[in-house]
Amino acid sequence: MRGKRIFIGSSSEELRLAEQAKKILEKNTNYQVTIWNENMWDKAVFRLNNSYLNDLIRATLHFDFGILIGTKDDKVIFRGSEEIQPRDNVLFELGLFIGRLGLNNCAFLVDEEIKILSDVKGISLARFKEKDSDSFNNAVLSIRESFDRQNDSDINFFPSSTLAAVYYENFIKPTCSHIINNGGLLDKNGYIYKKCTIKIIIPKKLTSDVNSQFQRIKAKIETKELSFEYLGRPRNINVEIIAEDGEVMIIDFPTILSGINYAISNLLPQDFNSMSVDYEAILSRELERFVYTLKKIALRDGFDDLIKIVDEDN
């Protein structure tokens, strides 16, 4: 599994804090941290000739976690008194990342003297004292610890996670339940294959036509069809199998993956180039999320020993 990616946003005036936070987050970890202003070709968040909002929307699909740094940038009049608050764009970015990544995967690293609006309360807040390095470092470490706890437990609401859950509930779970309840795979003729495995084949990359992609993979494998009763429903499940010496391997190609391409294309701005490196990177990331979510749900239900997820070359 690739390293988790973290986005750090701040005002231009407080880039030094973002850089300090990056060093702490990356020290002895597998996190890949990108600050909003980094302009290396493979890490740039805001690019020339691109709109600010489009770049932000793209960024929310690239990262696993978001940290926004709130410092004493602007004075505002609040109910007749003067207050200090972060830049409006920092608050906007915080809301955008929370909306995409969820509350547990975002944090607001904020100066303790800043007034926090009631709408912001309830998210992960890490307070620090201005010009106090220890205070700032401890606040960043608390965020890192919070993100560490998410690494092995999060199943989020990205398109891939939703599709993996649907695929699991409609195929993997009833198939595994049938195998367990019947002591194996019971075909419509009454024969039981006692040793069963579900082999889920995942393409290396997603194309615009996933169905044709799977047909090409399927053509390389000699299988036969088998039908068995769908647990709890008045219909059968038809599967492709490889049977040998009383053992059976169910071969499945999750064509539901085509929904990732469709969902991502609708989440991104209309003028986003679907042939770009960025788009391919987002698709690849969603493919990883699909596999990750599928494994986590199977492990949760105790079916992980019945499934094997492989890429198309295995």
Swiss-Prot record:
Domain called TIR: residue spans: 5-129
Disulfide links within the chain: none
Top-level taxon of the source organism: Bacteria
Signal sequence coordinates: none
Protein residues bound to 3',3'-c-di-GMP: 171, 234, 252
Keyword Nucleotide-binding: yes
GO biological process: defense response to virus
Catalysed reactions listed for this entry: NAD(+) + H2O = ADP-D-ribose + nicotinamide + H(+)
EC number in record: 3.2.2.5
Pfam families according to UniProt: CAP12-PCTIR_TIR, prok_STING
Molecular function via GO: NAD+ nucleosidase activity; NADP+ nucleosidase activity; nucleotide binding
EC primary class: hydrolase
InterPro entries assigned: CAP12/PCTIR_TIR_dom (IPR019302), Prok_STING (IPR046876)
Activity regulation, short description: NAD(+) hydrolase activity is strongly stimulated by c-di-GMP, weakly by 3'3'-cGAMP, very weakly by c-di-AMP but not at all by 2'3'-cGAMP. Self-association of TIR domains is required for NADase activity.
UniProtKB keywords: Antiviral defense, Hydrolase, Nucleotide-binding
Glycoprotein found in the keyword field: no
Ranges for region STING domain: 160-314
CDD domains in UniProt: STING_bact-like
Entry's free-text remark on domains: The N-terminal TIR domain mediates NAD(+) hydrolase (NADase) activity. The cyclic nucleotide binds in C-terminal bacterial STING region. Comparison of structures from 2 different bacteria suggests that cyclic nucleotide binding causes domain rotation to form a lid which seals the nucleotide-binding pocket. Upon binding to c-di-GMP the STING region closes around the ligand, which is bound by residues from 2 adjacent subunits.
Family affiliation: In the C-terminal section; belongs to the bacterial STING family.
Subunit structure as annotated in this protein's UniProt entry: Homodimer. Forms homodimers; in the presence of c-di-GMP forms filaments with an ordered array of parallel-stacked subunits.
Function: Effector protein of a CBASS antiviral system with NAD(+) hydrolase activity. CBASS (cyclic oligonucleotide-based antiphage signaling system) provides immunity against bacteriophage. The CD-NTase protein synthesizes cyclic nucleotides in response to infection; these serve as specific second messenger signals. The signals activate a diverse range of effectors, leading to bacterial cell death and thus abortive phage infection. A type I-(GG) CBASS system.
Protein name: CD-NTase-associated protein 12
Annotated organism of origin: Capnocytophaga granulosa (strain ATCC 51502 / DSM 11449 / JCM 8566 / LMG 16022 / NCTC 12948 / B0611)
